[in-house]
A protein has these predicted regions:
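Extended soluble regions of mature proteins
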Residues: 21-218
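Bacterial Sec-dependent N-terminal signal peptides
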Residues: 1-23
Length: 218
């Protein structure tokens, strides 16, 4: 009896692994919904309806977050662990280089995030997704819906959810003290030109991560 249970579990796990499609190249488009429930317009309200388009090619990813305020692009090389931020707001353009330690510091709130899984499912962008609850060291929680049908080779572009056994197609985040939700509108496996991950050679003011932190504190 014990052997049959072990065998059944092995078959189930094997079926899950082999049914997953590894995303080595493609594009995922997420829409952002923010509801401050406040009659007075807030900064977060301006982000409602923003989009985050993620381009993946092997170890490389490029996330373009576009709102009425401007565009912020995050380019990650998962081999070197180096990250570049391109910020275009109000006519100003900045290119910020982050070393691996800088990227870890930026996302330190998600260190040691743990997930619990619930038997709650829904379809997002054509994929069956399971509900998970992420819990941070601070005690803060957030809801994620992920699919085990897809698994990116590079999951650094979604730092908070990178330990999930699949791709998050809907997830909560915090903007200020308000909850916001990213939901995937589409997933495609179209080829992505390698030039998409080239860094601009002009037009941007290049600053370090430390300089960007000082600018934010001023």
């Amino acid at each position: 009896m014990k052997k049959s249970i072990v065998l059944s579990c092995f078959i189930f796990l094997a079926a899950t692994v082999f049914s997953q499609k590894r995303i080595t190249e493609g594009v995922i488009v997420y829409n952002l919904v923010v509801n401050t429930n406040d009659s007075t317009p807030k900064l977060a309200d301006g982000l409602d309806g923003a989009t985050n388009t993620v381009y993946i090619k092997g170890r490389l990813s490029r996330s373009e977050f576009v709102s009425i305020y401007g565009t912020q692009t995050t380019i990650i090389d998962n081999k070197t662990k180096n990250v570049t931020l391109l910020k275009e707001y109000g006519g100003k353009k900045y290119m910020i280089t982050l070393l691996p330690a800088d990227w870890t510091e930026t996302n330190k709130k998600y260190d040691s995030v743990s997930f619990s899984f619930e038997n709650d499912y829904k379809t997002i962008a054509g994929y069956n997704c399971r509900k998970a609850i992420g819990k941070l060291k601070s005690g803060e929680t957030f809801i994620v819906y992920y699919t085990t049908d897809l698994l990116p080779d590079n999951q650094e572009f979604q730092y908070s959810n990178k330990t999930l056994p699949g791709l998050a197609l809907e997830y909560e985040t915090t903007i200020g003290n308000k909850k916001a939700v990213f939901t995937a509108a589409s997933v495609s496996f179209n080829p992505v030109p390698i030039a998409k991950f080239d860094l601009p050679k002009s037009g941007f003011r290049v600053i370090t991560y430390e300089e960007s932190k000082k600018a934010r504190s001023n």
